[in-house]
Amino acid sequence: MMKDGMTLSHPDKEVRDYWIEHGKRSRKIAEYMGKETGQTCINNFWMPDGMKDNPIDRYTPRKRMMEALDEIFEEKLDEEYTMEAVESKLFGLGAEAYTVGSHEFYMATASRAISLFVLMLVIFIQQK
């Protein structure tokens, strides 16, 4: 139920609530998988939220996303079985101008609530 290029940052509470519930359930699934396998399951959160054009208000979508993430991660789970990660979005088709989940946004999020922060590094290997 992605709408207008947004999920957790969408102004429509119904859209946000759908993705909040999805996030909560994915955490429980990851914890279950960790318990069943006896290994820590990494649950990576990546949201595609963004806009093609420069918005006047960059703060409000990020505020909505932060509140949604706080709700998703409210319940503490056993890190022996699952650890959460957030992954920033650089840009994408349809979101060239503004990305809600920027690198800086997720660095702040990870420092206060999340176990891991995924750094996407691109390495170019020259083939001979």
Feature locations, PLM:
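Catalytic alpha/beta core domains of metabolic enzymes, predominantly
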Residues: 116-128
